[in-house]
Regions:
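Chitinase-like catalytic core of GlcNAc-active glycosidases
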Residues: 1-143
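Helix N-cap and loop-to-helix transition residues
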Residues: 31, 112, 142, 158, ...
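Charged/polar, solvent-exposed surface patches and flexible loops
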Residues: 40, 44, 118, 148, ...
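Active-site segments of SGNH/GDSL-like serine hydrolases
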Residues: 95-98, 166-170
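Short, conserved beta-strand edge motifs with alternating hydrophobic and charged residues
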Residues: 124-126, 163-167
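Residue-level marker of positions within ordered structural domains that often coincide
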Residues: 128, 158, 169
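Catalytic-core region of carbohydrate-active enzymes that cleave or remodel glycosidic bonds
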Residues: 140-162
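Glycan-binding loop/region signatures in secreted carbohydrate-active enzymes
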Residues: 168-240
Length: 240
């Protein structure tokens, strides 16, 4: 098995709300016993999969700073439940990128790093997503933002607990017209690096292969400050 083959790897079971605010809110407020059921289910799956080293909690799209006390209490209850079942079980929590208290660019101000430090063994900070499907084109993890997250997190949390997430994806933004006129909600579509390469080499095109365009002119640019590559497809004129 993989576990026997790589015994140095910790295997965690991810429990997530898939970014549904309604689920986060119900768990936080224990609506109709939602949090009680959630905690009992965590115990159930640890019993079902005894080989797991612990739990990875990925709860996203919480609410504003006014809910931070209740949100912290929820994570406290999760942590205590895991440790009561087995103190050796590892608990990782996934946290939004923040540069200060009440400093989320995405409205995730329920999260206060310093308050959550006591209720995790490790914390994976989602330090990516500054640029996203609905934003203007730009680096997914701009340097100043990434450094701000690092500086804040290491001051209020145990640095040995912290893992920073790095983006392994990019975006293809359509900027020649508004999303409304294109029949889309957002102007951006996520890409792997391989997909981005296919755009640049003509594997993908904007004509849906009718007819295909074998030679797609691009301008490529490397932002050495933010360490981010850019590619501008369909540039037919000189660019300086």
């Amino acid at each position: 098995t993989y576990i026997n083959r790589w015994p140095h790897i910790k295997w965690l079971l991810t429990v997530a709300n898939d970014g549904a605010n309604s689920i986060f809110r119900a768990l936080r407020d224990n609506t109709d016993g939602a949090q009680d059921r959630f905690l009992s289910e965590i115990v159930r799956i640890m019993e079902k999969y005894p080989w797991c080293d612990g739990i990875d909690i990925d709860l996203e799209r919480g609410d504003g700073y006014s809910t931070h006390t209740e949100s912290t209490a929820m994570f406290c209850n999760i942590y205590n439940t895991v440790k009561a079942y087995d103190p050796a079980k590892h608990m990782n929590i996934c946290l939004p990128g923040m540069t200060s208290v009440n400093g989320s660019v995405g409205g995730e101000n329920w999260c206060v790093y310093g308050d959550l430090d006591a209720y995790c063994d490790t914390a994976s900070i989602m330090s990516y997503g500054m640029a996203w499907a609905g934003s203007a084109p730009g680096p997914v993890s701009p340097r100043s933002w990434l450094e701000g997250i690092y500086d804040y997190a290491t001051k209020v949390m145990n640095p040995d607990k912290i893992f920073l997430g790095m983006p392994a994806y990019g975006w293809n933004w359509q900027i020649y017209d508004t999303p409304e006129n294109l029949g889309k909600t957002y102007r951006g579509t996520s890409n792997t690096y391989y997909a981005a390469k296919l755009w640049m080499t003509g594997g993908y095109n904007f004509t849906d292969d009718a007819p295909p365009q074998p030679f797609l002119p691009i301008v490529a640019y490397w932002d050495d400050y933010d360490k981010a590559p850019y590619a501008f497809p369909h540039v037919y004129d000189y660019m300086e």
